[in-house]
Design a protein with these regions (language model features):
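Phosphopantetheine carrier-protein modules
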Residues: 15-34, 52-61
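Catalytic nucleophile serine of serine hydrolases
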Residues: 37
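C-terminal structural segments of small proteins and small subunits
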Residues: 60-77
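Thiotemplate assembly-line natural product biosynthesis machinery
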Residues: 1-21, 73-78
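Conserved catalytic core of two-component sensor histidine kinases
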Residues: 41
Length: 79
């Protein structure tokens, strides 16, 4: 499973708690209420543990977490 699909699956299964939910890679996760502050922390922990990528605190900003595509683009140069 590629990084984008893995992140989307994690969001659907662990944050939305609905593996059958529709989640487009460009959906605004924050405006839609899918990600809140606690969910972002959970997602960062997943990225660090499952993908082995350290996410600096100063990089946890709206532009990097607004969608699955934005997050994958942010993560690309990190590993």
């Amino acid at each position: 499973m590629d990084r984008k699909a893995a992140i989307a699956e994690y969001i659907k299964n662990e944050i939305m708690r609905n593996k059958n939910a529709k989640l487009d890679y460009d959906d605004d996760l924050l405006s839609a209420g899918i990600l809140d502050s606690l969910a972002i922390l959970q997602l960062v922990a997943y990225i660090e543990k499952a993908l082995g990528i350290q996410v600096p605190d100063e990089d946890v900003v709206y532009d990097n977490f607004k969608s699955v595509n934005a997050l994958v683009e942010y993560l690309q140069p990190l590993k």
